[in-house]
Structure formats: structure tokens, C-alpha cells
Design a protein with these regions (language model features):
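Active-site glycine-centered loops adjacent to acidic/histidine catalytic or metal-binding residues
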Residues: 12, 41-42, 74-75, 148, ...
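Histidine-centered catalytic micro-motifs
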Residues: 145-151, 177-186
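Short acidic, glycine-rich surface-loop motifs adjacent to enzyme active sites
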Residues: 44, 138-155
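Acidic/histidine-rich helix-loop elements
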Residues: 7-21, 47, 88-98, 153-156
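Extended active-site neighborhood of metal-dependent phosphoesterases/phosphodiesterases
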Residues: 50-143, 158, 166, 172-175, ...
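Acidic, histidine-bearing metal-coordination/catalytic regions of metal-dependent phosphoesterases
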Residues: 1-9, 14, 29-33
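Active-site metal-binding motif and surrounding structural segment of the metallo-beta-lactamase
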Residues: 29-46, 138, 177
């Protein structure tokens, strides 16, 4: 059954988690019916530091205990090239490509929408075939992609031609409605 829904999208909370906490509580007050919250990476500044994670969740108390968080890996979760503390925080779908590693990329359907969460810290090629299959095998009306590093950026040095070329072609092929990205702090 198709159920109308909304969601909240944010990214790059890592700098000033107290300020971010205020924003997320405002979003919850303004949109208490939002089905879930998507975070497009950089949830914390130091992904290998437990204190950063404690602060992240503490600042979201009253929101993430009521609404689901849909996280995406950013570069800050890869502190020391190891996102294991990020992976320890969540029980994510284990339906991503084997090449990417467990729970680093995943997809899910909600109502009449497909959400595909990608790990842009890895080469786009490692997830391209799986990404194509997710869209090809879905009958969802609405299609969303979530990843951290921007395909197009307001800063030339942050542009990601690999994401644009490889994932962008797949997004175009399946008429993806929206690509939600982070990293630019815009």
C-alpha cells in the first residue's frame, strides 16, 4: 500500500554537534510526522573517537529514539581509514555489494520509494553494478540516491568526476528523482 510520507535530510553534522542538535530538534518540532532522517555522511568529526559518537547521539536524544536514522558514510567516519566505529553504531541492511564491505552501501524501499545509500569513499566502480541492479529490480515510483562526496560541487576542487560519470549515468538511465549528497557544508 502506498502511504504518503516525508523525511528530513541533513549532512555534515560533525562541526558543532550542539548546534546540529538544535537544528535536528527544530526539524522534529516542525515536521513531527517525518518518517525518518537521512544523514549524508560526516555525522561526527572523528569517526574513531567514541566521545564524538556519544555527543552525536546525545544531541539527538528525543529524535532518534522516536524516528529512524538512515546514515551514510562520509570521509570523517573513515578516520584512520577505518569506519568500524560507525559500523558498530548501526544495524544496517546487509544487502549491499560484497566488494564494498558489509553495511557500507545498502538499499531499502519505503512506501513507493527506493532509497539507495552508497559509500563514496570507495571507487564508484565497486558499487556500479549493484547500483544498477537496485534500480532495475525496483518497481518504486520514486528513486533516491544518498552519498557523501558530491558529483557536482560549488567548489571545483570538491567535484567528483568519477561519481558523476559512473553513478550519474546510472541515475540518468533509471530517471533517479533525487541524489542527496553532502561534504560541501552548503
Amino acid at each position: 500500500k502506498v502511504v504518503p510520507f516525508s523525511f528530513v535530510y541533513m549532512g555534515d553534522a560533525q562541526n558543532g554537534l550542539d548546534r546540529w542538535g538544535s537544528l535536528i530538534h527544530t526539524a522534529y518540532r516542525e515536521r513531527p510526522d517525518a518518517a525518518f532522517y537521512i544523514m549524508a555522511g560526516d555525522l561526527v568529526n572523528r569517526g574513531a573517537e567514541r566521545n564524538d559518537w556519544d555527543s552525536f547521539f546525545q544531541n539527538a536524544t528525543g529524535v532518534f529514539d522516536r524516528r529512524q536514522l538512515v546514515p551514510c558514510l562520509g570521509n570523517h567516519e573513515y578516520q584512520n581509514n577505518d569506519p568500524s566505529l560507525y559500523l558498530d553504531q548501526f544495524a544496517l541492511p546487509a544487502n549491499g555489494p560484497a566488494e564494498a564491505g558489509p553495511e557500507r552501501a545498502y538499499s531499502f524501499e519505503y512506501s513507493n520509494a527506493l532509497f539507495v545509500v552508497l559509500d563514496s569513499n570507495q571507487l564508484p566502480e565497486t558499487q556500479a553494478e549493484w547500483l544498477d541492479q537496485q534500480f532495475a529490480n525496483s518497481k518504486a515510483v520514486w528513486k533516491f540516491a544518498v552519498y557523501h562526496h558530491p558529483a557536482y560541487s560549488s567548489s571545483a576542487r570538491r567535484d567528483n568526476p568519477g561519481v558523476r560519470k559512473i553513478w550519474g549515468a546510472i541515475f540518468d538511465k533509471y530517471h533517479v528523482d533525487m541524489a542527496l549528497q553532502g561534504h560541501d557544508h552548503a
